[in-house]
Amino acid sequence: MNKKDQFHSLKENPKNIRFEEFCNILNSFGFIHKGGKGSHRVFTKEGIPEIMTIQNCEGKAKPYQIRQFCKLVEQYHLLE
């Protein structure tokens, strides 16, 4: 699945996304895992001042964090 397909899939249904799948999608968009504590992981991307902090909730990603990621993709035109 390419980046556009991944993005549209996330945007259409931000629920029931596995945490590890979301981490892989962040990596495919150029975000780098910078650490975190406990169930949280911190991702950053050069040129984007916002930091993505995501958390593992029983193996799933939080829907509001997926929506935040989608807003960043649109705001910084990461699909282009």
Report each predicted region and the residues it spans:
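Terminus-proximal functional modules
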Residues: 1, 11-14, 51
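A short, structured beta-strand/loop element
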Residues: 28-55
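Mixed-charge (Asp/Glu-Lys/Arg
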Residues: 3-11, 71
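Polyanion-binding surface elements
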Residues: 11-30
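C-terminal structural segments of small proteins and small subunits
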Residues: 57-80
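Absolute protein N-terminus
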Residues: 1-2, 80
